């Protein structure tokens, strides 16, 4: 229910005023739960008023996000009585020409970046007058890309600002070290040593190594510099890249982290979303959590994926956990979600911010916790610190027991009134 004179609605309307003043062209970087979708709704309502016969196109990266607009009962189009709106998943959109008054690109990070061809196609295939790009967070290369197209920042609003305003639940990001067992530690150490042996060829410079992977001419330049044959440099490129993939896959499937995610979820018994980088890991977690858990990943049919989301949202079922592999980082909202757990990750800040956003929707009395499980003294720890740079409310713990103590202490302080949770 939208309150027309609430501080949030007044702020959202001010964002639209800034957008119009900028020629009705620009992007907003607004955290999940603060109301970025309603800013899109306001832009559509303005277009409906000024151009009642003109079409509006919304481009989204996934069916989940499309459903948020088109659902016959709870979609934004239905709830707000929007007219002349058509919603497209981006892969379908770029297959044909389009003509509209307003083009909205939701989760624009999927169509922007130094190497992105998708944004070019969306723009080139669309004749439009107004452009609004929505996202919760962008990395620097996305911003540079958009600025190059003359798409400027209209408004930035962070999760901490949302908490301070009382629009999001207070939260903590708790980083918990999970050790490798003896056999896995030996395996990782050998793998990492082999990686570094070949990395030395490129002066331990990731950019040089990746340039050699993608640019054959640069390999020749480096071979001349080192006094090597091209065959030898090609072998180093192959072995470095191969060992990087092996190390990554190993860290994506660490059994001790998967088992820790299961134990923590069972112990805390909060409504929980679990994130990882492998379907096998997501499957194992779902199986261990039993009937209380559903899955969501790319190997499922669209029908089954939608059904599983419905089971989690429906308070009448026993389902309270969802295990996801490279999915649900965006476009999935459930105010009751209180706990997030990441058991494998990449180094990208974008993914970490989006996953955190899944648990921050405001719910009375809720404090949200996001648990980051990592293997200390490995590349996984470096990925963790990279992904959490500039993140607020981050605590590095020593053990799972310390995690339990923090949450129990918070509960006690809420009950005795020491912590004021709205």
Describe the residue ranges of each PLM region.
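Post-DEXD/H (motif II) to motif III coupling segment of the RecA-like Helicase ATP-binding lobe
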Residues: 113-171
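Conserved interdomain hinge at the start of the Helicase C-terminal
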Residues: 183, 187-196, 245-288
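Conserved segment of the helicase C-terminal RecA-like domain
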Residues: 358-387
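Inter-Walker segment of RecA-like/P-loop motor cores
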Residues: 63-99
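A short beta-strand element within the Helicase C-terminal
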Residues: 100-104, 323-324, 330-346, 351-352, ...
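Conserved pre-motif I regulatory segment
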Residues: 1-29
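Conserved helicase ATPase core of P-loop NTP-dependent helicases/translocases
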Residues: 67, 273-275, 280-329, 351
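Walker A/P-loop
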Residues: 23-43, 275
């Amino acid at each position: 229910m939208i309150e027309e004179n609430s501080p949030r609605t007044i702020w959202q309307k001010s964002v639209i005023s800034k957008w119009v003043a900028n020629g009705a062209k620009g992007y907003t970087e607004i955290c999940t739960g603060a109301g970025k979708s309603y800013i899109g709704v306001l832009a559509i309502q303005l277009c409906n008023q000024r151009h009642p016969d003109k079409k509006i196109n919304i481009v989204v990266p996934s069916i989940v996000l499309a459903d948020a607009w088109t659902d016959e009962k709870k979609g934004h189009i239905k709830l707000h009585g929007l007219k002349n709106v058509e919603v497209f998943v981006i892969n379908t959109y770029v297959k044909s020409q389009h003509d509209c008054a307003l083009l909205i690109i939701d989760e624009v990070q999927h169509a922007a970046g130094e190497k992105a061809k998708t944004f070019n196609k969306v723009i080139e295939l669309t004749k439009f007058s107004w452009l609004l790009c929505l996202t919760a967070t962008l990395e620097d290369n996305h911003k540079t890309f958009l600025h190059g197209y003359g798409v400027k920042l209209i408004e930035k609003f962070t999760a901490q600002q949302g908490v301070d305003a009382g629009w999001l639940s207070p939260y903590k990001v708790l980083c918990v070290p999970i050790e490798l067992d003896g056999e896995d530690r030996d395996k990782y150490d050998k793998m990492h040593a082999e990686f570094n042996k070949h990395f030395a060829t490129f002066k331990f410079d990731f950019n040089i190594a990746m340039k050699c992977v993608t640019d054959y001419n640069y390999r020749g330049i480096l071979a001349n510099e080192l006094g090597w044959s091209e065959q030898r440099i090609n072998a180093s490129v192959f072995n470095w890249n191969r060992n990087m993939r092996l190390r990554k896959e190993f860290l994506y499937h660490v059994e001790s982290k998967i088992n820790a995610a299961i134990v923590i979820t069972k112990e805390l018994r909060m409504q929980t979303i679990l994130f990882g980088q492998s379907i096998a890991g997501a499957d194992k977690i779902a199986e261990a959590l039993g009937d209380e858990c559903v899955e969501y990943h790319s190997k499922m049919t669209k029908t089954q994926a939608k059904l599983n989301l419905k089971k989690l949202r429906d308070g009448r079922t026993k389902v309270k956990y969802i295990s996801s592999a490279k999915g649900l980082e965006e476009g999935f909202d459930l105010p009751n979600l209180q706990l997030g757990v990441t058991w494998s990750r990449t180094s990208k800040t974008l993914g970490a911010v989006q996953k955190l956003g899944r648990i921050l929707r405001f719910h009375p009395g809720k404090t949200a916790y996001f648990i980051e499980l990592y293997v200390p003294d490995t590349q996984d720890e470096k990925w963790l610190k990279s992904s959490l740079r500039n993140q607020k409310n981050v605590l590095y713990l020593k053990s799972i027991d310390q995690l339990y103590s923090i949450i129990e202490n918070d509960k006690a302080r809420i009950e005795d009134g020491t912590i004021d949770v709205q």
